[in-house]
Amino acid sequence: MTKSELIEILARKQSHLAYKDVELSVKTMLEHLSQALATGDRIEIRGFGSFSLHFRPPRVGRNPKTGETVSLPGKYVPHFKPGKELRERVNAVHEQ
């Protein structure tokens, strides 16, 4: 599902809200989540999951085109850990 598909679905389900209001709400929420992660904050949404940063240490990689070894710096990457309710809901759908 893309961001625009999410906005479409929410706008249809919440017909009392204007499409532009739903669009602004989704974009604002995603911007705040992104900003919180960028500043190193952990985000926890009970029942859904948590977002945090994990550090990937520096390593030696290889350029697949030339075969040359390349030194890659360490970096932080976003990490999502699903909550118990989300895991159970996903598993229930796939166990049928």
UniProtKB/Swiss-Prot annotation:
Keywords: DNA recombination, DNA-binding, Transcription, Transcription regulation, Translation regulation. SMART domains: BHL (SM00411). InterPro entries: Hist_DNA-bd, Histone-like_DNA-bd_CS, IHF-like_DNA-bd_dom_sf, IHF_beta. PROSITE patterns: HISTONE_LIKE. One of its GO terms (molecular function) is DNA binding. GO terms for cellular component: chromosome; cytosol. The keyword Transcription applies. One of its GO terms (biological process) is DNA recombination. Residues 59-78 are annotated as: Disordered. The keyword Transit peptide does not apply. SUPFAM superfamilies: IHF-like DNA-binding proteins. Transmembrane segments: none annotated. This protein is one of the two subunits of integration host factor, a specific DNA-binding protein that functions in genetic recombination as well as in transcriptional and translational control. Heterodimer of an alpha and a beta chain. Belongs to the bacterial histone-like protein family. This is Integration host factor subunit beta. It comes from Thioalkalivibrio sulfidiphilus (strain HL-EbGR7). The gene is ihfB.
